[in-house]
Amino acid sequence: MQFSLIPFISSFALTVIFLPLFIGFMRMKHEGQVIRDEGPKWHEKKSGTPTMGGVVFMLAGVISTLWVLIWQKDLNKTAWILIIAFLGYGIIGFLDDGIKLYFKRNLGLRAWQKLLGQIIIAALIITLAFSDHFAFELYIPFAGMVRNSFLFSLFVLFWLVGFSNAVNLSDGLDGLATGLSIIAYATYAWIAYQERNWVIVVFTLSVIGGLVGFFIFNHKPAKIFMGDAGSLALGGGLATVSIFLHRPWSLLLIGIVFVLETLSVILQVISFQTTGKRIFKMTPIHHHFEMLGWSEWKVDIVFWIVGLIGSIIYLIIWG
């Protein structure tokens, strides 16, 4: 199979064509984002902005991946696992978004319901990997390579659930999670290309194409949000790609902003529950910088630069 930009172009085209129609449909139905009460007050003006846009780039990415791999006669079990992870987590997010819109509230699925769904999808991915004779090897720093299917399965479960939620936490500003995801998926596309892993190249390029098309409508001021349907799909996809490239730890650098966003929430909760004091003005940490007076664009650009630096450092040292 030869390298081609067809996955990117086709996914981009599908998103750019159908997203405006989706935005128009959501506006006609008066279906828009419900802004959380505890969020920054200036975000209240975003209330009513169409959401669930992730459905469009998610489907565009999947359609592009499928037709290119079928055309190239390279559709294998790895491709199906990537698609199932991407779609599976996206469906959980879709249900979450749908409940929020239907009941006109900021609470969708309950935490345990969302977690259960994420665990089920992760368990399905692990089962399919077993049937595909995937090498259940995990390199643990200072301990070396560990070949233990049970330990590896627990790690995959944690990785998929953790990073799907990490991207979700980062989706709080116009264009932020979209830009960070483009950087991360582009980095993995390059790694997959270097390793001649064409299935992952096609998948990542398809996702990038959809994201670039989506960014046209999602940058500030956003005409649409991706919703949990998009952010959970992106996080689940990234985690699965890192595992199937046998480079799971790479996501700590390539997805460094997602990691920092998650850590800020964890530290804030621990600090408040143990001392009654908050470390940050508001979490996830992008809101902290907003509270310091940074504009959304400034936060976006600085965070994108941090994400890009993390990816470059990884490629220089281990790429």
Swiss-Prot record:
What GO cellular-component annotations does this UniProt entry give? plasma membrane
Q: Keywords on this record?
A: Cell cycle, Cell division, Cell membrane, Cell shape, Cell wall biogenesis/degradation, Magnesium, Membrane, Metal-binding, Peptidoglycan synthesis, Transferase, Transmembrane, Transmembrane helix
Please name the InterPro entries in this protein's record: Glycosyl_transferase_4, PNAcMuramoyl-5peptid_Trfase, PNAcMuramoyl-5peptid_Trfase_CS
As one GO molecular function, the record gives: metal ion binding
tRNA-binding listed as a keyword: no
Q: Which GO biological process categories is it annotated with?
A: cell division; cell wall organization; peptidoglycan biosynthetic process; regulation of cell shape
Q: What chemistry does it catalyse, as a reaction equation? A: UDP-N-acetyl-alpha-D-muramoyl-L-alanyl-gamma-D-glutamyl-L-lysyl-D-alanyl-D-alanine + di-trans,octa-cis-undecaprenyl phosphate = Mur2Ac(oyl-L-Ala-gamma-D-Glu-L-Lys-D-Ala-D-Ala)-di-trans,octa-cis-undecaprenyl diphosphate + UMP
Localization: Cell membrane
Q: Which Pfam families match?
A: Glycos_transf_4, MraY_sig1
* Family, similarity comment: Belongs to the glycosyltransferase 4 family. MraY subfamily.
**Name used for this protein in its record:** Phospho-N-acetylmuramoyl-pentapeptide-transferase
Disulfide pairings: none
Domain of life the protein comes from: Bacteria
Q: Which cofactor does it need?
A: Mg(2+)
Identify the pathway.
Cell wall biogenesis; peptidoglycan biosynthesis
Q: EC no.?
A: 2.7.8.13
The protein's role, per its UniProt record? Catalyzes the initial step of the lipid cycle reactions in the biosynthesis of the cell wall peptidoglycan: transfers peptidoglycan precursor phospho-MurNAc-pentapeptide from UDP-MurNAc-pentapeptide onto the lipid carrier undecaprenyl phosphate, yielding undecaprenyl-pyrophosphoryl-MurNAc-pentapeptide, known as lipid I.
Its predominant location is membrane
Which EC class heads this enzyme's classification?
transferase
- Locate the transmembrane regions by residue number: 5-25, 51-71, 79-99, 116-136, 149-169, 172-192, 197-217, 224-244, 252-272, 299-319
Identify its membrane topology class: Multi-pass membrane protein
